[in-house]
Amino acid sequence: MKAAVVEEWGRAPIYTDHPEPVARDGGVVATVEASALTNLTKGLVSGKHYASGELTLPVIPGADGVARLEDGTRVYTGALKPYGMMAERTLVDPDGAVVIPDDVDSVTAAAIPNPGVSAWMSLEHAAAIRPGDNVLVLGATGVTGSTAVQLAKSAFGAGRVVVAGRDTTRLDWLRTVGADDAIAIGTDDLRARVARLHAERPFDAVLDYLWGEPAEQVLDALGTSELAARYHHTRYAQIGSMAGLTMTLPAGILRSAAITISGVGLGSIPPEVIGRIRAQALPKMFAMVAAGELQLGVEARSLTEVERAWTAKEPSGTRIVLTP
């Protein structure tokens, strides 16, 4: 069969021949229809991701995707090691698959789960969003951030959602799908805007997809605002690091305000919670997509273009999906 194959850590995969998968240990061979080119997929084969050690080269990338089982059922699933989803066929566990409704196409269905499940875990588990909560989404213009904005309002009942990001066109669009206010990073004074909004109505939760300097400014605003003298608990969920892998956090910030910081990733959420969210929330999100209540930009490309797609800059707010 044809597949995308990574032969060296950190290098783009090549489109080449690969041995067919063989059914074993409860896994069945399925025909792949689509697999999203996500940051997780790229990170795992970079050799630098904290889960890269579980892989052995050469490897077929593709953490998850849409496949068709032998009986014709179309499902969202992950591939069983050592296979990935960026191939014509792969090995899957049918018991862990989620059936895709007929009114959601395979490309969209492949794009939704990664940002959707991540956003849902962040909202439910780390940020613990409750109806009426005041939420700040830092780095909201990306695929996962914009998904979180929509779910915060429509699925979790957030009372106010403030979005922050650099792409002003995307910020304007986010106002049409649930955002109540927007902060343009690089144009607005991020720290001052967050401090003022926090003083007017304290943030119950922050979803941070950036880290780095923007996170420093936000945490400084939360920790040194006029509210520092009054107790209000803010749940800070750290999800991404698009603006930097490190940041400086003065100890005084954590002592001057009730801020709880927790991470969202493969090792920070209990496996049973991840499994439950995939099983219960994905069908809800597929239904929301079909009803037009959850929107995500997608761009389909042939798997034959994997080398070019891998190194190309992803359009803002759009997820590239590869199809065999």
Which residues make up each language-model segment?
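Mid-domain Rossmann-like dinucleotide-binding core that forms the NAD(H)/NADP(H) cofactor-binding site
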Residues: 112-188
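Glycine-rich phosphate-binding loop and adjacent beta-alpha segment
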Residues: 213-291, 324
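C-terminal hydrophobic helical "lid"/dimerization subdomain
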Residues: 1, 272-324
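Short, glycine/polar-rich helix-capping loops at beta-to-alpha or helix-loop-helix junctions
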Residues: 86-87, 165-173, 246-251
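Short amphipathic alpha-helix with an adjacent loop that forms part of the alpha/beta core around
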Residues: 189-201
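Glycine-rich beta-strand-centered segment in the early N-terminal region that forms part
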Residues: 20-37, 48-84
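N-terminal Rossmann-like NAD(P) cofactor-binding module of classical short-chain dehydrogenase/reductase
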Residues: 76, 206-207
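NAD(P)H dinucleotide-binding glycine-rich loop of Rossmann-like/cofactor-binding domains
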Residues: 61-64, 75-141
